[in-house]
Amino acid sequence: MVTTELLGEMKTFLPNLKVETSDQQVTVYPQTESEISEVLKYCNENKRKVQVLGGGTKSSLGFPNETVDLKLCLSEYTGIVEHTVGDMTVTVKAGTRYEELQEYLAQHNQRVALDPSWPEHATIGGVIAANDSGPKRLGYGTARDSVIGIRTVYPDGRIIRSGGRVVKNVAGYDMNKLFIGSMGTLGVLSEITLKLRPVQKSESLLILSFPSGNLEEVRSFAIKLLDSMMEPVSLELFNPGISARLLDKNVYTLAISLEDVESSVRYQEELIQKLCPTEAELEIVSEEGAKQFWKKVYTTLPNGNDSKQKDADSEKAVSMKIGVVNLDVVKVIRESQLLSDGQAVTVEAHGGLGTGICQVMIRGSKEDVVQTITRLREYAKTLNGYGIVRYLPGSLAETVDIWGDKPSYYPLLEGIKAKMDPNRIMNPNRFVGGI
């Protein structure tokens, strides 16, 4: 059998490499960059397909190919390589858990300005490879805004360095952008250098509820806020379905997060109170309450490493990401609620009025879920946006096209893949168009 054969090859080829087998699958746990390089080189020469893992929280993104020959897990390739406190930069191994990194940096009053899903389990390599970001993307930006250098192990075993370890290091093409968000289809990120920010002095969360359901009020308020001098780090709209679960409020709600020195936060709170529509209900949440709220938000998306979610396949839970022009998020959230009210499905949705990114969770029967995916994707197209499926139960794999129409630049992506991974061994089917 291939599993037995590959297991024997790995133990002979790299006798000190940790190797495990389960469910007819070989998993290796490299602890050094050279081991990652040797494993990839061997797999490339022998055309063995590889799935790259960190904490496993994003293992469900894209459509993982279940016939990969080997899983390369970076959970034991961890640690801080270099932290320059004065320059506010840190270089870290890709398998380091995101929350572990933040706890270390907090000792120096610094942090990485990102808010990925499942921060307790996600690894920094997975966050960067998936370009993961959350509702605070409005103020924080994305991984592309935080990364200043990457070391990547190519499929043929070569180790390439792009960017550097200081903030001002750009000369020529910014190769970092090529790997951020590539879902491990071009190589394995081994080390990442990030620029840091100081830990915020004060944090506040304002919840605006709209019992009347008048989303034009929401839109008008958002325009006023975005046109003002205020700098919220999030402006996230939640439909009644998810508001009921997170806030015990079965109405449209708007979550505004503020982070700055305390005087600035209090000043912005006062301005928002003055701009607040008369029909809206305003609640200012304590700092600890704000942290607990966002923690719940970050764990609403499916966790690819959660066995309970895998076992609950019968629920047909599907996650979608929809991207539109920022204020069109109001229309997407409204449409999601209409679909939930009018069909035998439950649709929970939230989106950033400053970013245009919506996250949608759909539950129901197989037929209703498929129909809802199609409706939302088509609706996004009418807004010149897109809709992709982030998580899909195996029973729907043959029914739903997770990527939708290939973008006009798809030939460029395919050409890059062919050049960097000609044997197509890296994370098959994990990127646009099944790359």
Where are these regions (language model features)?
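N-terminal flexible segment immediately upstream of the FAD-binding catalytic core
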Residues: 1-41, 48, 55-88, 287-313, ...
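C-terminal substrate-binding/cap subdomain adjacent to the FAD-binding core in PCMH-type
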Residues: 129, 148-306
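A short linear hydrophobic-aromatic micro-motif
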Residues: 49, 113, 231-236, 343-350, ...
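A generic structural motif
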Residues: 26, 249-259, 355-362
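Short, surface-exposed ligand-recognition loops at beta-strand->loop->(often short) alpha-helix junctions
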Residues: 1, 209-216, 262-263, 321-331, ...
